[in-house]
Design a protein with these regions (language model features):
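Short, ordered loop/turn segments at secondary-structure junctions
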Residues: 29-30, 86-88, 127, 166
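Glycine-rich phosphate/diphosphate-binding loop of Rossmann-like nucleotide-binding domains
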Residues: 46-125
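Alpha-helical segments flanking ligand/cofactor-binding loops in enzyme cores
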Residues: 7, 71-72, 151
Length: 170
């Protein structure tokens, strides 16, 4: 019995799995990053010594594959998730509609200070996400008020900070 981990596009995975008799898991795709989020959930519980369902989780940053997986984890593990991002970079309408149907513990703020208030854990990622084809300077400027620094961290509930690296533009 074997498991294979592939970093392929979603549609290639779907096609590829039709030719296998063993399980295939999504390690990373443009739409999700479940293995990272599952390992983050384990890390959070190990450090905080509490089930994640008892913690307030915060995401500061762009809506991307990691956030989509964190949203799915929030529904699955029943934890509060506060998302802080500029309005233009909120999760897609499809994701927001799914959240409304599945969870009342996910909140979106266009103000980082409101998003981190009371957070036990703060997640972030690069501002320029996987396969982003954007004006980098402009996007970084749009996230200026969402910089995670000591001042923002002090507004949390003595939060731990998780970032997938490399760092520098979070």
């Amino acid at each position: 019995y074997s498991n294979y981990l592939f970093e392929l596009l979603d549609n290639k995975i779907e096609n590829f799995k039709n030719h296998l008799t063993i399980p295939v898991i999504n390690g990373l795709s443009p739409s999700s990053h479940p293995t990272q989020v599952l390992s983050d959930v384990f890390t959070v519980e190990e450090i905080k010594k509490k089930p994640i369902s008892k913690l307030n989780i915060c995401w500061i940053g762009d809506s991307n594959n990691v956030l989509d997986s964190l949203i799915a984890a929030s529904v699955k593990f029943s934890f509060q998730l506060s998302i802080g991002c500029p309005k233009k970079f909120e999760p897609s309408r499809k994701v927001r509609e799914w959240v409304k149907k599945n969870n009342r513990k996910i909140f979106i703020y266009n103000d980082a200070t409101k998003a981190v208030k009371g957070a036990d854990v703060i997640f972030s990622d690069k501002v320029i996400s996987l396969n982003d084809k954007v004006n980098k300077k402009k996007k970084i400027e749009q996230f200026k008020k969402f910089k995670i620094d000591k001042k923002l961290m002090k507004l949390s509930n003595n939060a731990i900070f998780l970032h997938c690296l490399p760092r520098g533009n979070e």
